[in-house]
Amino acid sequence: RESLVKHLKEGTVDIALMEEYFIEDKEIKVIETEEYPFVVVAGTEINDYKELIDVPLLKRDTMLTNKYLDQFEKMIGFNLDKRISINGSIETMKNLIKNGLGFAVLPYYSVYEEVIKGTLNVIHSFDKSEDRFQIVLIRENEDKEGISKFVDFLKNYKLNRELFSEKKIR
């Protein structure tokens, strides 16, 4: 996160999308977006949450991941002890999951396309979501046409949540 702010200030990045992160800097503008849901996703070979007991959890060390993981463990009634910490991107995690190397708790927007294509399975979708991501940019750049159009697009984009009308846990 700190490196994204650094890249913004250096001008190598115009806009950053982040999970909730408190930034106290007058040069930086932070725009909250709509809430976004989290899901438990696994490869296509996993069809039921009970199968996860022997599958490694690919875990990003974020507050939101921890929050939803705690909820999931309480709900399923067992601890997910096989854990692998991932410092890479969500794309890295998705590729590991597709190759059968684990499962993860991820924001739905990040796996939407794979779920629609059938390359990832949603094992559980969480009922309530109060979490938001942030659009972060340098204040003096907010009126630039390309940046303002992109920010407007992000503010108005609605995730297709049809999958959330399905059963919540498999």
Where are these regions (language model features)?
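Central regulatory/effector-binding core of bacterial HTH transcription factors
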Residues: 1-24, 86
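Hydrophobic residues within well-ordered alpha-helices
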Residues: 8-9, 52, 95-101, 137
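A ligand-binding cleft/hinge motif common to bilobed small-molecule-binding domains
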Residues: 20-26, 90-123, 129
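Flexible hinge/capping segments at coil-to-helix
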Residues: 28-68
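Short beta-strand->loop
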Residues: 29-39, 117-131, 141
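Secondary-structure junction motif
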Residues: 55-79, 160-167
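Short beta-strand-to-loop elements that line the ligand-binding cleft
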Residues: 79-89
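A late-sequence structural motif
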Residues: 123-164
